[in-house]
Amino acid sequence: MERVHLFFHREQLKRKGTAKGLFVTDRSVSPILLTQRDRAEKASYEISWEKSLLGERTLFLNAEQDDPSLMRRRLAYCFFDQIGVPAPVASYSFLTINGQPEGIYLNIKNHQPAGKRSYGVKTADPRVPLSLFNNDSSAFLHEFFILIRTAGDDELAERIKLYLDVKLFFLWLIGNTCTNQGFYYTFCLNESGRLYVSPMETRSLAVQEWYEEDPLLTKGKTLSSRLLSIPAFRSQYHTLMKNVLKRSFTIERLSPLINEWHLDICQSAADDPFIKKSPFQIEKEQTNILREIEERQDFLQAHLARL
């Protein structure tokens, strides 16, 4: 596990909400701007560079205070990546601040689109509410919305492929149905000029939303509902989800990652002043995640049969 050291004036951070400081690893020493993202006892941080020899611009250090396993968000990002959805890269770091141990953090770097163009949205609803596409949108997104709102099914099925990577959008929805986490996200343009959706970390910590009344994310005044009203797209979505549930969202596929990360956490847990659990309790969290995957798999299979 990488050791990360932050040096800054806590009073400046408390007074202004941001503080200048130093970010130190075995590889580099960099001046940074630090922002505290919440008021938890073990706080989460956003770190920004103006210039970096290693090319970093922003990273997020998440304390994962609401997840005693420290693994669920990392597993979600990794799962998105495995099924082909560009996602943030996450790893573990052990953080010290001004020489004092703060403990294990999830170190997250957002996906950088190849085209360097992206459109952030102000929602964590993965179905993409159509209200997002308003007059304040970019010209491209506004044109996209006009197509969705006015085109008939046949025209939409034909022309939407000029604007949206439909398969990747469906995989984005499937990733959300499986992981059942809360994510902010951004629209990105790929090299062929088509939109895709990528989960992202922001300064605000995403709040988990529940869609148990709509577990397959097919309802509402949303982009997903509009596309899935077309039989060919609904069939494609069904096939993709069936394949993901069979091949990717499985104990066999995900347990090696969970085991590896669990061992990494256990090696540093005793030095984390905020981890109060015994080794047995930490081990139990690993078992809980595997049980959750199995239960979610069964739940989604039952709903998929009615799609």
UniProtKB/Swiss-Prot annotation:
InterPro entries: Spore_coat_CotH_CotH2/3/7 (IPR014867)
Location in or out of the cell: Spore coat
Domain of life, per lineage: Bacteria
Primary subcellular site in the record, as a coarse category: other
Transferase found in the keyword field: no
Pfam families from the UniProt entry: CotH
Keywords: Sporulation
Coiled coil start-end: none
GO biological process, one term: sporulation resulting in formation of a cellular spore
Similarity comment text for this entry: Belongs to the CotH family.
Functional note: Involved in the assembly of several proteins in the inner and outer layer of the spore coat.
Name of the protein in question: Inner spore coat protein H-like protein
